[in-house]
Amino acid sequence: MIKDKHLIDPMDFTVEELKEIFKLAHEIILDPEKFSHVCDGKILGTLFYEPSTRTRFSFEAAMMRLGGKILGFSEPNSSSASKGESLSDTIKMVSIYTDIIAMRHPKEGSAKVASLYSSVPIINAGDGGHQHPTQTLTDLLTIEMLKDGLSNHTIGICGDLKYGRTVHSLIKAMSRYKGNKFLLISPKELRIPDYIREEILRKNNIEFLEVETLEEVIDKVDILYMTRIQKERFFNEEEYLRLRDSYILNKEKMNLAKDDMIVMHPLPRVNEIACEVDYDKRAAYFKQAEYGMYARMALMAKLLGVL
């Protein structure tokens, strides 16, 4: 049973539980009106201690489309956190007023801390450079919908593999499905952390290759996952500016790729995908954002036990 569980890490749910969520997401996609009142009377608390547009809107739209309501804040200055209130006290109070909480926080591990003090399910909407499990649900649902399942894919991940929480979560999640291989494309300074390389990939005998140019591997890729170089994760602006334009996907590079490859991106993008790529049938990132709302609808319905 998924009811009343917290979602802190993409590995918190078993493969079978994920299958259950995706099955419901499929049903919602086919007939959203059928589910428009399942959360009548339910309230989602949205605690965003860090700026967000897409993730916050996606959660709010998801709850509203299920018939529920939203309480929360989109920046800490508009909450009691600006007065010095502790995270634990905020969570205790908000869980009195709401039925489920989605929280984004800049500090790694904050969602886990929140789960210790909450009387309602906590959904981690991003904790620093650590985890972003609902983006992972979005990514998995997109792959399942557009690539006929979650196994036997060659997945190219390009850009910021060091600080990108979506990247770490995606590798962990896709490593659970058989036959997946990873092509990890980044400058040396932004390679995946050692714990991902050693504890997830090597420990589980998963095939992977680290390269520095997109052109040398793009023809082998089934799923290309692009990421932006995240300015907010850098302490040194000079280093950020040097690496910002490392990888730009354009029409010329797309001409080297498979006809049935899909291009994904967690968004927002800066300049790492040229706008000309938007018109390519393989560009899946806006469809991915749409699937994110359906994934969150299914997730919240399951956690609340209404379906």
From Swiss-Prot:
The keyword Nucleotide-binding does not apply. It is an enzyme of class 2 (transferase). PROSITE patterns: CARBAMOYLTRANSFERASE (PS00097). One of its GO terms (biological process) is amino acid metabolic process. InterPro entries: Asp/Orn_carbamoyltranf_P-bd, Asp/Orn_carbamoylTrfase, Asp/Orn_carbamoylTrfase_sf, Asp_carbamoyltransf, Asp_carbamoyltransf_Asp/Orn-bd. The keyword Transferase applies. Keywords: Pyrimidine biosynthesis, Transferase. It catalyses: carbamoyl phosphate + L-aspartate = N-carbamoyl-L-aspartate + phosphate + H(+). L-aspartate binds at residues 83, 165, 228. It comes from the Bacteria. Its EC number is 2.1.3.2. Pathway: Pyrimidine metabolism; UMP biosynthesis via de novo pathway; (S)-dihydroorotate from bicarbonate: step 2/3. One of its GO terms (molecular function) is aspartate carbamoyltransferase activity. Heterododecamer (2C3:3R2) of six catalytic PyrB chains organized as two trimers (C3), and six regulatory PyrI chains organized as three dimers (R2). Catalyzes the condensation of carbamoyl phosphate and aspartate to form carbamoyl aspartate and inorganic phosphate, the committed step in the de novo pyrimidine nucleotide biosynthesis pathway. This is Aspartate carbamoyltransferase catalytic subunit. It comes from Clostridium botulinum (strain Alaska E43 / Type E3). The gene is pyrB.
